Amino acid sequence: MPSLEAVEAFLVMNESELLQDFLVGLIAAPQLAVFFEKYPRLRKIIDREWPGWQRRLRKRIHDTNVPDDLAQEFTLYQHQLLLGSGEFFRRLPATLAALDSQGSPFSHKAHQLCPDGKITHSDSFHTLFLQQWRLSLVARTLTLHHQVMEQEREMLQQELQQRMQLSGALEPVLVENENAAGRLWDMSRAPTHHGDYQLLVQYGDFLAGQPELLQLAERLGRSRAADPQDHADTQLEIRRVLVREPAVMPEEVSGIHQSDEILRLMPSELSLLGLSELELEFYRRLLEKRLMTYRLQGDAWREQQIQHRVTYRHHQQQPKGPFIVCVDTSGSMGGFHEQCAKAFCLALMRIALADNRRCYIMLFSTAIVQYELTADSGIDQAIRFLSQRFRGGTDLARCLAQTCTLLQQPTWQQADAVVISDFIAQRLPEETQGLINQLQKQDGHCFHAVAMSPHGKPSIMKVFDYIWRFDSGIKGRLLRRWRH
């Protein structure tokens, strides 16, 4: 059974134009126009979806088979095209009967062209019959095409509305620039429920109410400057220069010299011809080109192309490395500590989206749970992370050991390791401390400690490059509220 794509191609229908009209109509929907006015950043991002939509629609058309009755009529039409004029007229009654039995919409028009079985055996009738039949097939194919496109339109509009609703709700929380808006839009493909992403919105509101926590995340997230890289590029270039050389037509006297140029003889040489005794001497010197003559010459300038090597040095900023965030989920980190830790991770996720970095979360207590908030399914993983409850023990050493294992892989070059904890834990093993020290000195990795309590153990925190303190206790909260 032929596909819709094959029938359209045989009938010489412009599929690209049909798809273009469909997509233009989709974007011009009133619901989308209102949304684009509210979130103009997403309008540019939608344009990137066109190639994917076109591939999706073409695949749907390719996979859609035409109905049996249309397939039978299309096959009959193809056979008629292969017949000569005489054979066509001989089989015409059988063709009309086949159209009647198939219930073809063209059957009525075919009988109108052959009233009472009277058929004019001419090439013009043959051509007219096939043209009218083709028009009927094109109309049926277009109807089927529009039905398929209408189904796709409904699914695409529903998908777009869900993604735009999600992107619009999370834009104030996660979007800082155009790059972040594009990555959020790509992440919105993963299915999520309305009630789920509201958790992200709630923590975004909480973060907005804690400006010191947000500022701390900004300072930590952008504390490492992007490493510049010099790139030398040597190539051959053509340089045009002006070269001075003697002119073909002399312009001025520049001295005297020996030559045979009669027109430039000095008067003393001409005097030799006046004495018969010296006349032979004159001719001898003429043959030897030893006559004293004026030297006349001028300057001319000519453009000359010279090839030379030129080295260009490009100073290019390299992208920053990813975040590996270790979050303490022990019981002592519950309550307000838990809210602050989750909001801090959300702020780092926002920075990672804006700076095109990865944000990898590791929850450590008695077991280690991992999430990547900037993956394609990052929104779903962020929701699952925010839904976690902090009720376990503390195994900081195990988490740091696993972090060091990750940092030794090429994927995690220039990564920043961030540990969010109250740092009320057991002393780190000497082996782990030595490994951290090696990663800091040899590989340039930075280890940050975000202390949620003023009672953290100094013996643990001394291994970190930077210590960022945020007092999430009652006293710290009261002081921050009093300042504001």
Swiss-Prot record:
Pfam families: VWA_CoxE. The keyword Chaperone applies. GO terms for cellular component: cytosol. CDD domains: VWA_YIEM_type. Coiled coil: none annotated. The keyword GTP-binding does not apply. Belongs to the ViaA family. Component of the RavA-ViaA chaperone complex, which may act on the membrane to optimize the function of some of the respiratory chains. ViaA stimulates the ATPase activity of RavA. This is Regulatory protein ViaA. It comes from Edwardsiella ictaluri (strain 93-146). The gene is viaA.
